[in-house]
């Protein structure tokens, strides 16, 4: 066992003495040492229950003959960090999480690990650590939040975010606004739609790194506790089998995950996280792969924010495996999963307990919601290296659109303008200097997009940015524009009134000015100076472009 290096032989007596100080017995020294990597904290709804999941995991480890040791990672709530300086720290936390797991696991020579993440950057951070370390590992994602129920409708965090715009426009009363605030977020779990956290949980299951059913089992559901305990038991077997993440996850696994992503209308943040994850697995995953697979994979289930269904409905309809069952003819069914079975073998054992709901909300390949998948990659003179849009959540009349630019150099300025009523139907809002380097940190523009949505403008106004979006964003919102403004990309050269062409079917995003004019603007471009200190300064120096996954070397 790997852990023998800290507990075997006379020279390790000091090590054993310290371990015994924590309560480890001589008989336990002979057992596998399992890290329980928990991102629990009590400021994030998606994490507030993870201590209970950790206890179930540890019970499972003990049942199977292992010795659990729990430690914690940081976790940022994108919802609480939204709309202010705090959002600059969200994406950079991904690498901090990965690095801290590496430090703890390498320093203490664990034999295996159970990873317990939840929420947007925490799940990819844990997954990236699994790929980098390549010791036996299994992931227990924290589970979705139940939707709230307000004014006879299911609600979620995006209901509140869009309520800000609706309230500022006088469309809802203060009483209605307060009801949304008080009742939309129902308790523990990651936000209730197919936003980034739940998308990444689905990616984890599709990649084969969590047990079947884990992604959509809700935070407060007994299923989640059972899966946690079973995962604790399974990790001990994984150690004995020496079945590591790199033996499970292959290039074909990533193709499977992207096809699931397209079928469920997942968050555009997968175009950041999956390439970064592939990098840690020693694999390549170019941005173009998402578009290639999107063209081949139909959109099969309409989930929030682009549709009416919540993860609650998705789970009851069969969850990730039910979608994979629909996609079976396209998937690589021979890919291994963490339970030791292939995807095909797991699907053979799938029981659909609510067949009527399954048939109602998960469509077929022959009769999909959309013929193409949820995400499209656009390129052109405004985004030579690419940009992304959740096409499944865009009104069809905005798929081909040209309009004048309204340019802002940060989200705050755009937000003030939107709430003041300065943005009119027909405009294209451009928010720049929000990329990985320019922010730094590549903030999400949810406050701005939700304000547009709340004011009823997402059927007549587009937003283009080198920043990114919440998984809860809907409408013609194009992000990850690369190269970013801070690197002198064309988005830095846009002026108020310039015409911008969006053509999603043709995958085009163009700035409608002459090449000569673009060259003249480029020649006089001087990037703004930033005064950044601390971790963000180091991040700004090391981070790569969004089209590479925003990896940090």
Swiss-Prot record:
PROSITE patterns: ILVD_EDD_1 (PS00886), ILVD_EDD_2 (PS00887). The active site is at residue 470. GO terms for molecular function: 2 iron, 2 sulfur cluster binding; dihydroxy-acid dehydratase activity; hydro-lyase activity; magnesium ion binding. Binds 1 [2Fe-2S] cluster per subunit. This cluster acts as a Lewis acid cofactor. Belongs to the IlvD/Edd family. PANTHER family: D-XYLONATE DEHYDRATASE, D-XYLONATE DEHYDRATASE YAGF-RELATED. This is Dihydroxy-acid dehydratase 2. It comes from Methanosarcina acetivorans (strain ATCC 35395 / DSM 2834 / JCM 12185 / C2A). The gene is ilvD2.
């Amino acid at each position: 066992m790997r852990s023998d290096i800290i507990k075997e032989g006379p020279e390790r007596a000091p090590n054993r003495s310290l371990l015994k100080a924590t309560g480890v017995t001589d008989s336990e020294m002979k057992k596998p040492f399992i890290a329980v990597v928990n991102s629990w904290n009590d400021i994030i709804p998606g994490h507030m229950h993870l201590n209970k999941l950790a206890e179930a995991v540890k019970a499972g480890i003990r049942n199977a003959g292992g010795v659990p040791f729990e430690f914690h990672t940081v976790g940022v709530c994108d919802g609480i960090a939204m709309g202010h300086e705090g959002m600059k720290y969200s994406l950079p936390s991904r690498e901090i999480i990965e690095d801290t797991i590496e430090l703890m696991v390498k320093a203490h020579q664990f034999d295996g690990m159970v990873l317990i993440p939840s929420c947007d950057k925490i799940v990819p951070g844990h997954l990236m650590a699994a790929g980098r370390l390549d010791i036996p590992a299994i992931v227990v994602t924290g589970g979705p939040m139940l939707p709230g129920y307000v004014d006879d409708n299911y609600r979620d965090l995006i209901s509140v975010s869009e309520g800000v715009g609706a309230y500022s426009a006088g469309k809802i009363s203060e009483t209605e606004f307060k009801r949304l605030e008080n009742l939309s977020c129902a308790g523990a779990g990651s936000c209730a739609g197919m936003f980034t956290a739940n998308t990444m949980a689905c990616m984890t299951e599709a990649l084969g790194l969590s047990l079947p059913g884990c992604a959509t089992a809700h935070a407060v559901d007994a299923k989640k506790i059972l899966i946690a305990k079973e995962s604790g038991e399974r990790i001990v077997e994984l150690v004995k089998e020496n079945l590591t993440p790199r033996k499970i996850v292959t290039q074909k696994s990533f193709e499977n995950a992207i096809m699931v992503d397209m079928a469920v209308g997942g968050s555009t943040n997968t175009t950041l996280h999956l390439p970064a994850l592939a990098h840690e697995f020693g694999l390549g995953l170019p941005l173009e792969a998402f578009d290639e697979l999107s063209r081949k994979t139909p959109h099969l289930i309409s989930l929030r924010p682009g549709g009416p269904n919540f993860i609650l409905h998705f789970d009851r309809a069969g969850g990730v495996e039910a979608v994979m069952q629909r996609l079976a003819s396209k998937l690589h069914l021979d890919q291994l999963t963490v339970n030791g079975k292939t995807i095909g073998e797991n699907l053979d054992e799938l029981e659909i307990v609510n067949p009527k709901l399954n048939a109602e909300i998960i469509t077929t390949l022959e009769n999909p919601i959309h013929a193409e998948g949820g995400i499209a990659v656009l390129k052109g003179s405004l985004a030579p290296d690419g940009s992304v849009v959740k096409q499944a959540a865009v009104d069809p009349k905005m798929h081909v659109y040209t309009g004048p630019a309204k340019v802002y150099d940060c989200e705050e300025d755009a937000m003030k303008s939107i709430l003041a009523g300065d943005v009119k139907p027909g405009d294209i809002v451009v928010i720049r200097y929000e990329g990985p380097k320019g922010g730094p940190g590549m903030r999400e523009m949810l406050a701005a997009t939700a304000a547009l949505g709340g004011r009823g403008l997402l059927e007549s106004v587009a937003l283009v940015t080198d920043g990114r979006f919440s998984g809860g964003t809907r409408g013609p919102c194009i992000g990850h524009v690369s190269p970013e403004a801070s690197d002198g990309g064309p988005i830095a050269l846009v002026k108020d009134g310039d015409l911008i062409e969006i053509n999603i079917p043709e995958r085009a995003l163009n700035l409608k000015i002459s090449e000569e004019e673009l060259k003249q603007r480029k020649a006089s471009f001087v990037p703004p100076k930033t005064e950044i200190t601390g971790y963000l300064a180091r991040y700004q120096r090391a981070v790569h472009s969004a089209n590479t996954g925003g990896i940090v070397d």
